[in-house]
Amino acid sequence: MVCLKTLSVFLAAFAAADARAVFKTQGHKNSEMIPDNYIVVMKDGVSQDDFKAHISSVSSIHSTNKAKRGTNTEGMKREFDIMNWRGYHGHFDRDTLEEILNDSKVDYVEQDQVVRISGLVTQRSAPSWGLGRVSHRQAGSRDYVFDDSAGRGVTIYGVDTGIDINHQDFRGRARWGTNTADRDNADRHGHGTHTASTFAGTAYGIAKNANIVAVKVLGSDGSGSTSGIIAGINYCVQDAQQRGILGKAAMNLSLGGGFSQANNDAVTRAQNAGIFVAVAAGNDNKDARNYSPASAPAVCTVASSTINDSKSSFSNWGPVVDIYAPGSDIIAARPGGGSTTMSGTSMASPHVAGMGAYMIGMGANPRQVCDRLKQLATAAIRNPGFSTTNRLLYNGSGQ
């Protein structure tokens, strides 16, 4: 295991070397680092051939160092290529890490960290109020008023704990995508099914006609890794590109961890590629600037509101928050059938992901959707937090 303090001293000795890559330390004191696991990001302009040559070289160096020192490091684990933003994740010893940092083609390296869902489960039955709230300027209505196109022709990627794609709320519109978390292609937690139901469920969802793709990046305990999240995002962009739906797609990330430049860069590339990205602000009642992917400027960062148009007590806040959406006591689907109630910025984010798909289905450009949602939003949130918007999601129904 590499101690970050020792590593900082170790790296400082090479600070004068212009070619040396930057080792980024995450900026959140509560970040849970994964020992000896690193995310390596290549410089812009590195060709596919040079990237492959670098991968081959690192694999060879790792094998040599492992044989020489008898370490138990696993080496290269996965590669990323999100619209020519290239990198990889690996389990490396200190000497291999030194060689990576000395390669002039490497932009930066950061240590992998644990990422968790941003939702809190509640086991009581409560009526869903979010749909009515986002389609009316005033609080109190239980009617959801919406254009009947409802996201038709748009695909939403649920990057989460998996999705029960056979749940009756999806009516055949959901399919399995990929799994970067484990070997169990099922939602054993329930979080991912709930968020998917919120963004595109027939009964509980915003974009009732959108297609749904399950991208499992978190396990049954609701946790995963930054590298696994990036691998999931990588899949979404490549899948959308292969299917010709860039410009007709959205992505929901109801998850987060400490600040990660690599995580932020990955979601930014996805957004710039033509996928509208909604992310949860986080549930620690703290400034969301210290969290990723919430702190990525290009995405739509969502805080949570209550039925009374107040900031949810748990919701993160701050200048990176783009909009509020219903997140307390939200009812939606659960794996195996039926429904359950959950609270969190995890529940707020899919309201915005679904609304993004709704807008895209009516002709909006994914790159402009967040700005459009902020223009439409209602100035309704009381005590939103220091330097935080008070704008609440609204679909422009005229009600």
UniProtKB/Swiss-Prot annotation:
EC number: 3.4.21.-
Induction of its expression: Expression is strongly increased during growth on protein-rich medium. Expression levels are the same whether keratin is present or not in the protein-rich medium.
Glycosylation site positions: 102, 252, 308, 395
InterPro entries: PCSK9_ProteinaseK-like, Peptidase_S8/S53_dom, Peptidase_S8/S53_dom_sf, Peptidase_S8_Ser-AS, Peptidase_S8_subtilisin-like, Peptidase_S8_subtilisin-rel, S8pro/Inhibitor_I9, S8pro/Inhibitor_I9_sf
Catalytic residues identified in the record: 160 (charge relay system), 191 (charge relay system), 346 (charge relay system)
Prodomain residues: 20-118
Leader peptide range in chain numbering: 1-19
A GO-annotated cellular component: extracellular region
Main location: secreted
Residue intervals of the Peptidase S8 domain: 128-399
Gene3D superfamilies: Peptidase S8 propeptide/proteinase inhibitor I9, Peptidase S8/S53 domain
Domain of life: Eukaryota
Keywords on record: Glycoprotein, Hydrolase, Protease, Secreted, Serine protease, Signal, Virulence, Zymogen
Residue stretches making up the Inhibitor I9 domain: 38-117
Locations listed in the record: Secreted
A biological process from GO: proteolysis
Family stated for the protein in its record: Belongs to the peptidase S8 family.
PANTHER family: CEREVISIN-RELATED, PEPTIDASE S8
Record protein name field: Subtilisin-like protease 4
Organism: Trichophyton rubrum (Athlete's foot fungus)
Taxonomic lineage from the root: Eukaryota, Fungi, Dikarya, Ascomycota, Pezizomycotina
Gene (UniProt): SUB4
